[in-house]
Amino acid sequence: MYYPFVRKALFKLDAERAHELTLQQLKRLSGTPLTKLIHQSLPFKPVNCMGLTFKNPLGLAAGLDKNGECIDAFGAMGFGFIEIGTVTPRPQPGNDKPRMFRVVEAEGIINRMGFNNLGVDNLVENVKKAHFDGILGINIGKNKDTPVEQGKEDYLVCMDKIYPYAGYITINISSPNTPGLRSLQYGEALDDLLAAIKTRQSELQARHHKYVPIAVKIAPDLSEEELIQVADSLVRHHIDGVIATNTTLDRELIKGLKYADEAGGLSGRPVQLRSTEIIRRLSAELQGRVPIIGVGGIDSLISAREKIAAGASLVQIYSGFIYKGPPLIKEIVTNL
């Protein structure tokens, strides 16, 4: 496979520049006959989850294609589902650069992007042009300058706009890079947000005559007590799925490595065991009442199997995909 050569060239560039360049090239391919260049024919391995049928259990995690510009290109690679975003109501530039760093020795990535995106209206236009026949998830967040107390309004604005086009919607309350966002994972703030989202979901279901499931994406840095509270809230509010987990603020496993002291969320192999443990504990707590989508450090068939064994119904990749490329998709889908 050509990917090791592509990776070698990309890894000579700054991490964000390489990311931009890759998306530019994939955007050129999307929706053209040239997608054949990256097409992988993979077996059909359907999984029913959240009331939807996924053509295979492997998805692309949110954050790679924030604006939904390369949906068809990623679809051609064989993903069973693709999650685009995080998108916010209004466009925003994100945090100052540099804001993405490869921790190569640990096969990790640190980012403090800060929900840089072109806004929900732009994303909707891109989704309308896509031809992907798998499940499309859309991950939504709040604008940086929206006070946390008013944060739920941002989620509702995004829901209104994406509902007709989404296979499922993910509520991102776990990015460490938007001030105050993670506070929405706790207690009354979480209950208030989830109640508003479920009410809006019912209204939109009546308006559009279709039910779009809601998933909540959580952090790996939750204590045992916090995790129990989150699980309780998810069940009480009849949330359709939970995505575990986002990036970690913990640096224990990369201490002393280059970029280890950079601020932001750490993803990739260093978060693998922690996210699997969260899935295991969450699964024990939820008892099958809310399905789990496992994400965090999956970089092989073995680590994908570990997430499933811990209680995940579906899995997603991001950092592992950066390090291993399309062959990782084939390895996991063919053998899982």
UniProtKB/Swiss-Prot annotation:
The active site is at 175 (nucleophile). The keyword Transmembrane helix does not apply. Substrate binds at residues 66, 111-115, 172, 177, 246-247. It comes from Erwinia tasmaniensis (strain DSM 17950 / CFBP 7177 / CIP 109463 / NCPPB 4357 / Et1/99). The gene is pyrD. It comes from the Bacteria. One of its GO terms (cellular component) is plasma membrane. One of its GO terms (molecular function) is dihydroorotate dehydrogenase (quinone) activity. This is Dihydroorotate dehydrogenase (quinone). Its cofactor is FMN. Belongs to the dihydroorotate dehydrogenase family. Type 2 subfamily. InterPro entries: Aldolase_TIM (IPR013785), DHO_dehydrogenase (IPR050074), Dihydroorotate_DH_1_2 (IPR012135), Dihydroorotate_DH_2 (IPR005719), Dihydroorotate_DH_cat (IPR005720), Dihydroorotate_DH_CS (IPR001295). It is an enzyme of class 1 (oxidoreductase). Binds 1 FMN per subunit. The keyword Metal-binding does not apply.
